[in-house]
Amino acid sequence: MELLRQKIENEGIVLSNQVLKVDAFLNHQIDPVLMHEIGQEFAKLFKHDGITKIITIESSGIAPAVMAGLALQVPVVFARKRQSLTLTENLLTASVYSFTKKVESTIAVSNTHLGEKDCVLIIDDFLANGEAAKGLAAIAKQAKAKVAGFGIVIEKSFQPGRDALVQMGYRVESLARIESLEEGKVTFVREVQS
């Protein structure tokens, strides 16, 4: 997605060979025009998959998920990372390790919002090692929901997340695939045109 690549090149900050900071438009300050376009792109990619719900994880996945939900006209459910006074019973849960925060947390979704009749699209802002994605897939599996695929805003292709999800049999659609962050420079995966 060209607009997203431009944003990454112009506003993203490479902090290390592993970390790209995109808080100017994606996961702190949010560019609503970009989010709208991201939602439209995910809707286009998954429009024939019978999506009934989108699931994501709080908080950075919510904006692109809501825009995709709007475009597909389906509800969005987000997994909570923090304990909630109102979310205590009938929970679908999974443990997720965050390499960015160096902490393991339990994510949770109420089983009243996800069930066996659902066909879900899982959306997240980043795909690196795939821990959040696998956690969301585990929650969908507990609900006996079908996973149509993963919509990823930015994929760090040099990390094992995509390969892990593909090996598990999942479809992965990433709007920007980063090959490298070496030497402080973002290098995108060159897509082969057929």
From Swiss-Prot:
Subcellular location(s) of the protein: Cytoplasm
Assembly with partners or alone: Homodimer.
Annotated metabolic or biological route of this protein: Purine metabolism; XMP biosynthesis via salvage pathway; XMP from xanthine: step 1/1
One of the GO BP terms on file: xanthine metabolic process
Example GO molecular function: xanthine phosphoribosyltransferase activity
Protein name in UniProt: Xanthine phosphoribosyltransferase
Family that this chain belongs to: Belongs to the purine/pyrimidine phosphoribosyltransferase family. Xpt subfamily.
A Gene Ontology term for the protein's cellular component: cytoplasm
Record-listed 5-phospho-alpha-D-ribose 1-diphosphate binding positions: A128, N129, G130, E131, A132
Keyword Cytoplasm belongs to the record: yes
Top-level taxon of the source organism: Bacteria
Family matches, as HAMAP family: XPRTase (MF_01184)
Positions bound to xanthine: L20, N27, K156
